[in-house]
Amino acid sequence: LQPMAIALASIADGTSMITENVFEARFRFVEEMVRLGADARTDGHHAVVRGIPQLSSAPVWSSDIRAGAGLVLAGLVADGETEVHDVFHIDRGYPLFVENLRSLGAEIERVA
């Protein structure tokens, strides 16, 4: 759940450190969070994230299920419209993801 935690940490007060000891490439998605304006960097098995008041919209690319979900959540709080590409990854793990977010009040649209 690191991508979701990093998305949250990117707009939270203070600095957060998230550690990943299993999957080496888990933090690849941090580069996409930086495209959204996140103040984040990786250092080996750690991601360090300093919270900022607001993310900005940008086109981003999902590399796996959890990264895609984290990018969508970050995009929902970003200023403007964010396009998340390669969302087929999300479909494998989160059926009805868009519909569930809409039922919670999210303004989200899936474009074919």
Curated annotation (Swiss-Prot):
InterPro entries: Enolpyruvate_Tfrase_dom (IPR001986), Enolpyruvate_Tfrase_sf (IPR036968), MurA_subfamily (IPR050068), RNA3'P_cycl/enolpyr_Trfase_a/b (IPR013792). It is an enzyme of class 2 (transferase). Its EC number is 2.5.1.7. The keyword Cytoplasm applies. GO terms for cellular component: cytoplasm. Pathway: Cell wall biogenesis; peptidoglycan biosynthesis. Pfam families: EPSP_synthase. SUPFAM superfamilies: EPT/RTPC-like. It catalyses: phosphoenolpyruvate + UDP-N-acetyl-alpha-D-glucosamine = UDP-N-acetyl-3-O-(1-carboxyvinyl)-alpha-D-glucosamine + phosphate. It comes from the Bacteria. One of its GO terms (biological process) is cell wall organization. One of its GO terms (molecular function) is UDP-N-acetylglucosamine 1-carboxyvinyltransferase activity. Its main location: cytoplasm. Keywords: Cell cycle, Cell division, Cell shape, Cell wall biogenesis/degradation, Cytoplasm, Peptidoglycan synthesis, Transferase. UDP-N-acetyl-alpha-D-glucosamine binds at residue 22. Disulfide bonds: none annotated. The keyword Ion transport does not apply. It is found in: Cytoplasm. Belongs to the EPSP synthase family. MurA subfamily. Cell wall formation. Adds enolpyruvyl to UDP-N-acetylglucosamine. This is UDP-N-acetylglucosamine 1-carboxyvinyltransferase. It comes from Mycolicibacterium phlei (Mycobacterium phlei).
